[in-house]
């Protein structure tokens, strides 16, 4: 891998280390991550331009390093890789980190239709559970209960006029997530500004911790519109945590018994 980094990036680290995420190395005080890119290739330019916008507006994300050909992706042994320069990578994020990141408003006429996205996810999971549920007793017994929360969230979201601000958000935000994932530009998207805060609070709540003070502080510091409060509630109702775990179980990455802590 040293030869790859030397040739494509004109960087000459003394050592390269491999982890579950990919590879990393140091040059001086700077830490670089060389990781596989698994998402849609057509989205790469949009992600790169978005990360430049964030950096130019003093919002920290890991800096994407282009290769000698000026490309974000480097094709090695049949796989695409990206190189990122990181400053923050092993610190656990706090609620204040999440709230600050999502406080940067984007003025756009972009339409975010969470209702349709959630409905498609519900239908897909319901079909898979009906087909495979006999292998997973806890999944089979609990799915209808959480599906009802999902349907209620969809109905509420679809009834809202969406007088709400957009901001940069994340595909997923979890309590005690490390800063490597949080500031990874490939994890960032655009959504309503309450998205990250809600997902963080749900994750913290299901870790057995109180979230009341965080919610009160957030509401006091942010002038949410009426519609934003409703979107906040709809996202709170939608059981992201449960559906994510169901998908992991179906893929064989988790076990049916892992549901017990969530549903008992």
Protein language model annotation of sequence segments:
Residues 2-29:
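ATP-binding glycine-rich phosphate-binding loop
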Residues 14, 38-41, 113-169, 213-217, ...:
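ATP-dependent phospho-/nucleotidyl transfer catalytic cores
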Residues 28-110:
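ATP-binding pocket architecture of kinase catalytic cores
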Residues 39-41, 89-91, 175-177, 186-187, ...:
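Short acidic, S/G/P-rich loop/turn micro-motifs used as interaction or catalytic elements
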Residues 123-127, 242-264:
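ATP/Mg2+ or Mg2+-diphosphate-binding catalytic cores
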Residues 154-197:
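Active-site acidic catalytic loop and adjacent metal/ATP-binding pocket
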Residues 179-224:
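Active-site Asp-x-Gly
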Residues 223-254:
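C-terminal structured domain segments
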């Amino acid at each position: 891998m040293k030869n790859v980094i030397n040739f494509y990036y004109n960087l000459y680290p003394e050592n390269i280390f491999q982890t579950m995420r990919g590879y990393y190395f140091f040059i001086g005080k700077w830490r670089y991550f060389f990781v596989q890119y698994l998402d849609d290739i057509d989205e790469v330019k949009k992600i790169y331009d978005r990360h430049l916008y964030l950096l130019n507006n003093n919002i920290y994300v890991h800096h994407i390093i282009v290769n000698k050909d000026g490309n974000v992706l480097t094709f090695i042994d049949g796989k695409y890789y990206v190189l990122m320069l990181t400053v923050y990578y092993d610190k656990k994020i706090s609620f204040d980190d999440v709230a600050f990141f999502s406080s940067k408003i984007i003025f756009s006429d972009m339409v975010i239709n969470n209702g349709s996205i959630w409905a498609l996810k519900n239908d897909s999971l319901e079909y898979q559970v009906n087909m495979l549920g006999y292998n997973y007793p806890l999944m089979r017994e609990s799915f209808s209960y959480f599906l009802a929360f999902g349907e209620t969230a969809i109905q509420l979201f679809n009834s809202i006029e969406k007088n709400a601000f957009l901001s940069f958000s994340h595909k997923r935000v979890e309590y005690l997530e490390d800063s490597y994932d949080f500031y990874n530009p490939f994890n960032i998207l655009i959504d309503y500004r309450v998205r990250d805060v809600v997902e963080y609070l749900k994750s913290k709540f299901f870790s057995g911790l109180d979230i009341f003070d965080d919610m009160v502080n957030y509401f006091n510091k942010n002038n949410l519109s009426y519609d934003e409060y409703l979107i906040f509630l709809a996202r709170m109702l939608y059981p992201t945590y449960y559906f994510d775990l169901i998908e992991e179980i179906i893929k064989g990455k988790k076990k049916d018994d892992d549901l017990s802590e969530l549903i008992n």
